[in-house]
Structure formats: structure tokens, C-alpha cells
Amino acid sequence: MSISAGISINAFDIIKPEHFNGPLLFTASTLRVHSPWFSNTFKHTVSVNYLYVPAGRPRTFPLIKFHYEFIPKKVYRRASNSFHSVENCFEQILRICIVFLSLKIYTLTLVIIKVFIRRSDA
């Protein structure tokens, strides 16, 4: 079975509703999967929350939302496992997506922390 997935970022929103005063806080990301069965399109939504407040300086609370859309381009089924081919397809693509999103979230976390630390030192 050969699977290739196309990845596109649909939206990037930063919301700053309130001011907080506290230490660095990173809340775990949430992964929501919308996958209509026997469909060739499904979406993943990832939400990551960050909070960085230097001592004595109130800062805003950025809520960062990423919306990733994964569309498999080609799916080849073999006659020997045609009964489980759709299920195997989704399992393979979900594994690829989860690894990709984990790396993206980890990298973004480091970048945001570095930016906030540089701004607070300036």
C-alpha cells in the first residue's frame, strides 16, 4: 500500500483576551480528528496554549490555534488485504500526522519561549 498525504495550514489565529501574572506555562496540545469513514479527506485541529509572564511584568495570554488539513493523494489497495485496506490507510496516515504535528508543536514551543525571553530581557 502506498500513501502520500498533502498537508496545508488553513488558519493561524492569535487571541489575547486577558492579562496574567505568573510563571511560564505550557498546556498540552489537543488533537481532534475528523475522519468520515470511506472518505479521502479528513482534518486535524491542534490547539496549543502558551503563557509567559516575567516577574513583575503582566503580559497577555496568547491562545494559538493551528488547523491542519490532511488529504491523502493516492491510495493503492492490494487484493490480499482489500477488506482492511481503508482501515489500514487511516491508521498509516494518522501515524504520519501525529508525528508531524508533534514535531511542529515542539519546535514552535521552543521558538515562542525564546522570543518571549528575548522581549522580557530587552
Curated annotation (Swiss-Prot):
Q: Which domain of life is it from?
A: Eukaryota
Assigned keywords, A-Z: Membrane, Transmembrane, Transmembrane helix
- One GO cellular component term noted in the UniProt record for this chain: membrane
Indicate where this protein is primarily found. membrane
Provide the transmembrane region boundaries: 93-113
Q: Where in the cell is it found?
A: Membrane
Q: What else is known?
A: Partially overlaps EXO70 and TRL1.
**What is this protein called in UniProt?**
Putative uncharacterized protein YJL086C
Recorded source organism is Saccharomyces cerevisiae (strain ATCC 204508 / S288c) (Baker's yeast)
